[in-house]
């Protein structure tokens, strides 16, 4: 069952799957409001890449 038909479910899924930050040094997943990496304490964070079809 595709979730692209229901915009509310799609918004929930997109927030759950793409709303976090990735450390550029070690690749760890961090919360979206993180200032430093939880694993290596680096400040070199980026948002999760999102490619919409």
Curated annotation (Swiss-Prot):
Parts of the chain that traverse the membrane: none
SUPFAM superfamilies on file: Zn-binding ribosomal proteins (SSF57829)
InterPro entries: Ribosomal_eL40_arc (IPR023657), Ribosomal_eL40_dom (IPR001975), Ribosomal_eL40_sf (IPR038587), Ribosomal_zn-bd (IPR011332)
Any GO BP annotation: translation
Pfam families for the chain: Ribosomal_L40e
GO MF assignments: structural constituent of ribosome
SMART domains given in the database record: Ribosomal_L40e
Family: Belongs to the eukaryotic ribosomal protein eL40 family.
Name this protein carries in UniProt: Large ribosomal subunit protein eL40
Organism: Pyrobaculum calidifontis (strain DSM 21063 / JCM 11548 / VA1)
Gene name per UniProt: rpl40e
């Amino acid at each position: 069952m595709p979730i692209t038909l229901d915009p509310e479910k799609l918004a929930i899924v997109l927030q759950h799957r793409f709303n976090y930050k990735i450390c550029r040094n070690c690749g760890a997943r961090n919360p979206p409001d993180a200032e430093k990496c939880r694993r290596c304490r680096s400040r070199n964070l980026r948002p999760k890449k999102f490619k919409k079809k």
